[in-house]
Amino acid sequence: MLLTFDIGNSDVTIGLWDHSTWRNVWRIPAKADQPELFYGIRIRDYFTETKLEVNVVESVVLSSVVPNMTEKIRNVIRSLFNMEPLLLGPSLFEKLPMKVLNPYEVGSDLVSNAMGAWQTYKRTCVVCDFGTALTFTTVSGNGEMLGVSIVPGLRTAIRALSQNTAKLFDVPLEIPKSALGTNTVTAIQSGLVLGYDGLVRNVVSSIRKELGEEIPAIATGGMSFVITSLKGFFFDINPNLTLEGLRLIGEYAAELKKKT
C-alpha cells in the first residue's frame, strides 16, 4: 500500500492507497509545537483502529508547505515505517511529465492538485482548493500549469476579523438564511460566506475569459463543502484530489527509479 502525507497549515492529511482505492483518509491538526511522539502515536493508533499493521505500507510520499513541520513528520515516517519518504520538491518537479510553473517557488500542494486534475479529468480545468488559503490552480489538458491565484481561506478570513477588531469574534461557517445579517454572527456569515461565493465565481470567470474557454472548475480541500450555493457551479467536488496527485507523482517517481 502507498501512504501519502499532505502537510498543510491547518491539518496533516494522510491517505492510505490500497492499489485501487483510498482505503482510509485521516486528518491530524498541524501544530508545530507538538512533539514527534504526538504524531507517531496518532498515526499508529489509526492503523490499530483499522486493524492494519504498519508493515502493509510499501512506500510513502510527502508534501509539505510548512517547513518547520517537514522534518518532524519525516522522522515519524522513518521511525514508524522504517523507510525514507519521497519528498516533493523542485528536483522532482523538473522530472514530472507535466510542466510545473516556477518549480523553485510553487507549493507542492499546488503541483499535486495540478497533477491530480490533469490525470483525472484529461482537460484544461481550474482547481479551487479550500484550505487555510483558497487557491485557484489552472492546468491545461496537456499537463501545463498555466497559473495560480491565492486568497485567504474562509477560516483565515474569520480569524483575521476576530484578531484585528475589538468586538468581532469567530463564528460557525454556515450559510446564512439572509444576506441581511441581524446580529454579529449572521452579519459575519453573510459577508464571508456569500462574499466568498462571489469571489470564487468571479476568479473562475476571469480565468475563463482570459483563456477564451469555459473550462470546468473542480473543488477540493477541507472547506470545499461549506459554500453549498457553489455545489452546482463546480464540475466536480473531489475531496481527495491533492492526495490523488501525490499518489500519481509517487507512482511516476517509482517508475523513474526502476529505469535508472
Placement of each model-derived feature along the sequence:
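Long hydrophobic alpha-helical segments typical of transmembrane helices together
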Residues: 210-260
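Glycine-rich phosphate-binding loop signature in dinucleotide/nucleotide-binding domains
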Residues: 52-55, 120-122, 210-213
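N-terminal glycine/serine-rich phosphate-binding loop of ATP-dependent small-molecule kinases
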Residues: 1-92
